[in-house]
């Protein structure tokens, strides 16, 4: 996430191992949060970064800070399922063409989530195209990109994210095929491990993202709790 924020020129703040993220616009659990928190003294230093506004803490379950955060008024606010797999090939078929994304990446991603194409995030997300360590893909219907996904590679590991599909092209196998392309790229790069995450099943029913991830060979490894700061 540090490099993703750097790509958009969005400042972050660090304290020890912890990293505070704060994207422009309304706060969201994904983009207004603290990562890598293992010491409450670091939280004391980072809270001021949010200027009294809302933020979340994505907590490593091994940090052992759950009870301390609850004592401070933080509340559990949905966990994320973390997944991991190797780089073995994953067969996937679609009538869409899968290829390298271009500067339309951000627009398609924004529209996939109902955001205005003029939002700040559009240019920010497109900034990862061609950036060191990033490998952005799209599914194309003719010449038009209709779905997105990216791989960020560091050392022998890769993170998969920025997945989105336009409503008009959901159910066409775009995300499974983009997942397969990113796995292939990871193998070409000599990576050994891939990680990703998504929301947990609601009422025991997994969402489309969860199902696509599992179908592509990822194994659930742990739940990462998110804690909302007191209002």
Stretches found by the model and what they are:
Residues 116-168:
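A conserved beta-strand-loop-helix scaffold within acyl/acetyltransferase catalytic domains
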Residues 37-102, 196-197, 202, 206-214, ...:
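Acyl-donor-binding surface of acyltransferase catalytic domains
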Residues 11-16, 61-72, 133-147:
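Conserved beta-hairpin
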Residues 27-38, 156-167, 226:
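Conserved acetyl-CoA binding element of GNAT-fold acetyltransferases
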Residues 32-41, 80, 89-123, 127, ...:
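Short amphipathic alpha-helix that is part of the acyltransferase structural core
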Residues 4-16, 51-54, 77-80, 128-137, ...:
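A short helix-loop-beta-strand connector motif used in the catalytic cores of GNAT acetyltransferases and
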Residues 41-47, 162-165, 171-188, 211, ...:
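Conserved acetyl-CoA-binding loop-helix of GNAT-fold acetyltransferases
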Residues 1-51:
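N-terminal charged segments
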């Amino acid at each position: 996430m540090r490099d993703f924020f750097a790509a958009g020129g969005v400042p972050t703040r660090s304290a020890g191992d912890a990293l505070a993220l704060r994207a422009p616009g309304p706060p969201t659990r994904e983009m207004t949060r603290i990562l890598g928190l293992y010491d409450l003294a670091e939280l004391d230093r980072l809270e001021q970064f949010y200027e009294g506004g809302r933020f979340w803490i994505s907590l490593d379950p091994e940090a052992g800070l759950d009870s301390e955060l609850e004592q401070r008024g933080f509340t559990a606010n949905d966990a994320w399922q973390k997944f991991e797999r190797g780089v073995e090939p994953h067969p996937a078929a679609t009538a869409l063409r899968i290829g390298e994304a271009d500067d339309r990446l951000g627009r398609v991603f924004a529209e996939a989530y109902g955001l205005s194409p003029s939002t700040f995030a559009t240019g920010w997300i497109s900034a990862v195209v061609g950036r060191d360590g990033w490998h952005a893909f799209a599914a194309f219907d003719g010449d038009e990109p209709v779905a997105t996904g990216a791989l960020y590679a560091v050392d022998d590991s890769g993170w998969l994210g920025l997945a989105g599909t336009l409503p008009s092209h959901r159910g066409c196998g775009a995300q499974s095929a983009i997942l397969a392309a990113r796995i292939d790229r990871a193998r070409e790069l000599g990576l050994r491990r891939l990680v990703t995450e998504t929301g947990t099943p609601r009422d025991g029913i997994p969402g489309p993202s969860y199902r696509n991830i599992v179908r592509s060979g990822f194994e659930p490894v742990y739940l990462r709790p998110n804690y909302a700061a007191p209002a």
